[in-house]
Design a protein with these regions (language model features):
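Hydrophobic alpha-helical transmembrane segments in multi-pass integral membrane proteins
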Residues: 51-55, 113-126, 183-195
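Selective transmembrane alpha-helices of multi-pass membrane proteins
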Residues: 62-93, 148-154, 158, 166-195
Length: 195
């Protein structure tokens, strides 16, 4: 397994802006960390369910259509390159604040089922880095737990450091995006070179 590429992909994807992280940051800025923790726990729970579903979906595809592994690797690498380009050219979006909304556990959990970033994160990480090397039930469960934990940690970090990240991203947004994009680009290219 390309362990460095795996870790880079996992951490870059989990810690860059996405629906979970932005909602956690805004909620923590507005309601405080303690109230936002319910949302974060919901995100972690939903994340775990999605990672398990992605694991067994990928395993089913590999066992049903063994030749799909190479195609899944190519697709995953192209998706990672797409993400890198999207990160480089992303612009700050207007943040709509609704003073009456406090995102809870159920909101955080259900968000994962419609969050394309999490679903593609799971499919990409598992099909590229895990299934080709470890496909026992124990491995799939442990990697799903790891991926869910890192996703949960990313969301918690965005809520803990919400105001600091907001200032940082406002001031250094393009540099931050460039570094994250280059790390994703490195991961995608190293995967393709291993095949």
């Amino acid at each position: 397994m390309a362990f460095v590429s795996f870790l880079l992909y996992v951490f870059v994807t989990a810690f860059t802006p996405g629906p979970n992280n932005i909602m956690a940051m805004l909620s923590a800025n507005k309601y405080g960390f303690k109230r936002t923790m319910k949302f974060c726990l919901g995100v972690g729970t939903g994340f775990l369910v999605i990672m398990l579903l992605c694991s067994y979906f990928n395993l089913l595809l590999k066992n049903t259509i063994p030749k799909i592994e190479f195609s899944m690797t190519i697709f995953s690498s192209i998706y990672m390159l797409y993400l890198a380009i999207k990160i480089i050219f992303s612009k700050e979006k207007n943040k709509e604040k609704d003073d009456k909304k406090n995102y809870g556990f159920l909101t955080g959990m259900l968000l994962q089922f419609i969050n394309p970033k999490v679903i593609l994160y799971g499919i990409t990480a598992i099909s590229t880095f895990i299934i080709p090397f470890n496909n026992s039930n124990f491995s799939l469960i442990m990697y799903s737990l790891f991926l869910a934990f890192v996703g949960f940690a990313g969301t918690v970090c965005w809520s803990v450091f919400g105001s600091m990240f907001q200032i940082f991203l406002t001031r250094y947004r393009s540099k931050f995006n460039l570094v994250m994009a280059l790390l994703l680009f490195y991961s995608a290219v190293s995967i393709l070179l291993e095949k």
